[in-house]
Amino acid sequence: YRIGVTPTLGPYLLPQVLPEIHKRFQALRLFVREGVPAELSQDLRSAKHDLILSTQPIAESGLDVSPLFRESLKLVLPLDHRLASKDVINRMDLVGEEVLTLDEHHLYHRQVTELCQTLGANTRRDFEGTSLDTLRQMVVMGMGITFLPALYVASEIRETDPLRVADVFGVNMYRDHALAWRSRS
């Protein structure tokens, strides 16, 4: 099977689930390719993929979509940020903050931008990352704060990293993931 995944999900979820899938279905061959959600949906429709694992929304025309799970987003700050030492960070603390995000070609950019609008924060347009790793490194260098998916945080951020990872109280921060396939397959 040819599976398309988003680069902000696949590398952090698949290592947790593929070993069990291979254990249960030893003859199953999976070919994984990353892409942004719009490309993945198009590639699924044109039969370049058999399945896609993506963040919602997935353009559903001609596709069957099965919601899988909701993933929380975490606030990530450099240790010298004014909020890093607070025991509890609430939504009002983020009003006016400049938030780093991925470039606009990623669905994650839109999700973070919408979250920032809800919080009264602003996305930085002068520095945009091309990967979640880039965002993490930009925060380490003190270039700003960001929101990172919980699966990424669990996989890539260590206690020894010079970062504070926090929840923000008073706002639901999450993204939804789904599996999609062609309706006729």
Regions found by a protein language model. Give the residues of each.
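Short, well-ordered beta-strand segments
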Residues: 2-4, 52, 76, 100, ...
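A late-sequence structural motif
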Residues: 9, 13, 163-185
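Central regulatory/effector-binding core of bacterial HTH transcription factors
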Residues: 1-61, 129
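Secondary-structure junction motif
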Residues: 98-119
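Flexible hinge/capping segments at coil-to-helix
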Residues: 60-99
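Short beta-strand->loop
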Residues: 64-74, 150, 159-173
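Alpha-to-beta junction loops
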Residues: 28, 44-54, 73, 121, ...
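Hydrophobic residues within well-ordered alpha-helices
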Residues: 3, 43-45, 94, 137-143, ...
